[in-house]
Amino acid sequence: VSMLHPRRAFGSALLYLNESNSVARAALAKVRAHLKAKGVRTWSVVGRTGQDALRRAELAIALGGDGTMLRVAREVAPHGIPLLGVNVGHMGVLAGTEAAGIGRRLDAVLAGRFKAEERWMLSTEVHRAGRRIFGPELALNECVIRCGEQARAITLFTRSGERFVADYFGDGLIIATPTGSTAYSLAASGPIVD
């Protein structure tokens, strides 16, 4: 997923929000008005986006916290839509633009003055007895595979494409991207992982 991607001017934007956050709802009105004044067509999204809107969008803006960013990244990444996060939530590591400075940030983005960050994503499928039972699903942070609600040991045979990786015996497996491993490291008072 591209957190921002320098390219042609942005003429349309999908505006995603965490609808349970009243600050996000207020920020949505401000962002929509600012973009409209700049001639950018917008669509507000609550829940999942229709395929037609995803085909037409040139930019996605997530108004919420990091949880909103993770949800929106899964949806827009397959379409190559760049994503800007506006932090109006509790955690704003990924959603790096603060709501108070959104007007200036939007002006910079629309003028092409920004630094793009490309992020790795995981695509996960679970197969049992040769049949896919889950996936493919995208993840920006991590994928967690476990047996179910009750912890018990299982054997996991892991592959990357057709290539064997390893067999694991335990109660589950966490596979993290650099973005996800940084979150785990920071939670343990560790460093940022590149």
Regions of interest found by a model, annotated:
Residues 1-59, 63, 71, 99-117, ...:
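ATP/NTP phosphate-donor binding region
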Residues 25, 67-73, 181-187:
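Short glycine/serine/threonine-rich phosphate/pyrophosphate-binding segments
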Residues 60, 83, 173-174:
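Short, well-ordered beta-strand core segments
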Residues 71, 75-89:
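Gly/Ser-rich helix-loop-strand patches that form or flank binding pockets
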Residues 89-93, 192-193:
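Short gly/pro/ser/thr-enriched loop/turn and capping motifs at secondary-structure boundaries
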Residues 167-194:
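Gly/Ser/Thr-rich active-site loops/lids in small-molecule metabolic enzymes
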